[in-house]
UniProtKB/Swiss-Prot annotation:
<dbReference type="GO" id="GO:0006486">
    <property type="term" value="P:protein glycosylation"/>
</dbReference>
<dbReference type="GO" id="GO:0047291">
    <property type="term" value="F:lactosylceramide alpha-2,3-sialyltransferase activity"/>
</dbReference>
<feature type="disulfide bond">
    <location>
        <begin position="139"/>
        <end position="297"/>
    </location>
</feature>
<keyword id="KW-0808">Transferase</keyword>
<comment type="similarity">
    <text>Belongs to the glycosyltransferase 29 family.</text>
</comment>
<keyword id="KW-1133">Transmembrane helix</keyword>
<feature type="transmembrane region" description="Helical; Signal-anchor for type II membrane protein">
    <location>
        <begin position="6"/>
        <end position="26"/>
    </location>
</feature>
<dbReference type="InterPro" id="IPR051142">
    <property type="entry name" value="Glycosyltransferase_29"/>
</dbReference>
<feature type="topological domain" description="Cytoplasmic">
    <location>
        <begin position="1"/>
        <end position="5"/>
    </location>
</feature>
<keyword id="KW-0472">Membrane</keyword>
<feature type="glycosylation site" description="N-linked (GlcNAc...) asparagine">
    <location>
        <position position="30"/>
    </location>
</feature>
<keyword id="KW-0333">Golgi apparatus</keyword>
<keyword id="KW-0443">Lipid metabolism</keyword>
<feature type="glycosylation site" description="N-linked (GlcNAc...) asparagine">
    <location>
        <position position="334"/>
    </location>
</feature>
<dbReference type="InterPro" id="IPR001675">
    <property type="entry name" value="Glyco_trans_29"/>
</dbReference>
<feature type="glycosylation site" description="N-linked (GlcNAc...) asparagine">
    <location>
        <position position="224"/>
    </location>
</feature>
<keyword id="KW-0328">Glycosyltransferase</keyword>
């Protein structure tokens, strides 16, 4: 039985947590992010559009180099990058394995039984056979950056073997610029598209699990069940009620990929127990997807990446009116470190930047 003093301490923590969440909610209601007028979006030079399209086509026309991405990452980061890392979870972790060392999203400590339950619902745990059969795969990771708008790269992006899209970034209405082919939609519950139109029957839905209720949500989506109301209370925004895909199209991202990205490659500090908030050590879904792509494909390209904070009035995304200045208010991610990482990959030739948001090569 717990001592009364410890019980009171736990009650106080819970009370303060609820109060803090309530305050943040009130602040959110009263805070309006500055909006950018998409109709007045900065002018896109037609010559630059042509150069971007030509460059992207040249990337595809060159002979694909087997294992190039993995080999390059291993040379660049040495022992900090594992060439043998599986991209998706295939079995529940044992206590002695790397997955059990950390809590989500860096591992599955104390969640082994939930992982096992999910895996039993998923008939497949790897890339589909038609993709595995390719001797050399080209990936493109499509970010949400406003820089994509106007480049008209859609047709070229559709020609990649594997097209990875992030969170709720839409295809409908933007296919001219971002294409309409999706191989992988990688996201967490709050980031999943709410519209059925953003899911195609052969997509892979790759779930990134951050917290306990994320497991409940994914189980409900796979089983096509309604998520209980009390579970919904633990999400910080509305989540999808249904994902119109068959169980064979769901995958669970290997959390060791997030751990490798955060602690080994970006060299963030490991998580520390804190009463409030969390360390700024969680990579963005975009950077995690780039590292995932190096494990999945032989060659990797990027499109729609890059934050130009010197242009605060330019659109942050290609699909909404949020300004670049909004990045100054986010506290979860270390944008500066991630930008340096992506720039290093582009400069060293590990990945190609098709839209020129990281380092223009055209």
């Amino acid at each position: 039985m717990r001592r009364p003093s410890l019980l009171l301490k736990d009650i106080l923590k819970c009370t303060l947590l609820v109060f803090g969440v309530w305050i943040l909610y009130i602040l959110k209601l009263n805070y309006t992010t500055e909006e950018c007028d998409m109709k007045k979006m900065h002018y896109v030079d037609p010559d630059r559009v042509k150069r971007a399209q030509t460059y992207a086509q040249q990337v595809l026309q060159k002979e694909c180099r087997p294992k190039f991405a993995k080999t390059s990452m291993a040379l660049l980061f040495e022992h900090r990058y594992s060439v043998d890392l599986l991209p998706f979870v295939q079995k529940a972790p044992k206590d002695s394995e790397a997955e059990s060392k950390y809590d989500p999203p860096f591992g599955f400590r104390k969640f082994s039984s939930k992982v096992q339950t999910l895996l039993e619902l998923l008939p497949e745990h790897d890339l589909p056979e038609h993709l595995k059969a390719k001797t050399c795969r080209r990936c493109v990771v499509i970010g949400s950056g406003g820089i994509l708008h106007g480049l008209e790269l859609g047709h070229t992006l559709n020609q990649f073997d594997v097209v990875i899209r992030l969170n709720s970034a839409p295809v409908e209405g933007y296919s001219e610029h971002v294409g309409n082919k999706t191989t992988i939609r990688m996201t967490y519950p709050e980031g999943a598209p709410l519209s059925d139109l953003e899911y195609y029957s052969n997509d892979l839905f790759v779930a990134v699990l951050f917290k306990s209720v994320d497991f409940n949500w994914l189980q409900a989506m796979v089983k096509n069940e309604t998520l209980p109301f009390w579970v919904r209370l633990f999400f910080w925004k509305q989540v999808a009620e249904k994902i119109p895909l068959q169980p064979k199209h769901f995958r669970i991202l290997n959390p060791v990929i997030i751990k490798e990205t955060a602690f080994d490659i970006l060299q963030y500090s490991e998580p520390q127990s804190r009463f409030w908030g969390r360390d700024k050590n969680v990579p963005t879904i975009g950077v995690i997807a780039v590292v995932l792509a190096t494990h999945l494909c032989d060659e990797v390209s990027l499109a729609g990446f890059g934050y130009d904070l010197s242009q605060p009035r330019t659109p942050l995304h290609y699909f909404d009116n949020q300004c670049m200045a909004a990045m100054n208010f986010q506290t979860m991610h270390n944008v500066t470190t991630e930008t340096k990482f992506l720039l290093k990959l582009v400069k060293e030739g590990v990945v190609k930047d098709l839209s020129g948001g990281i380092d223009r090569e055209f």
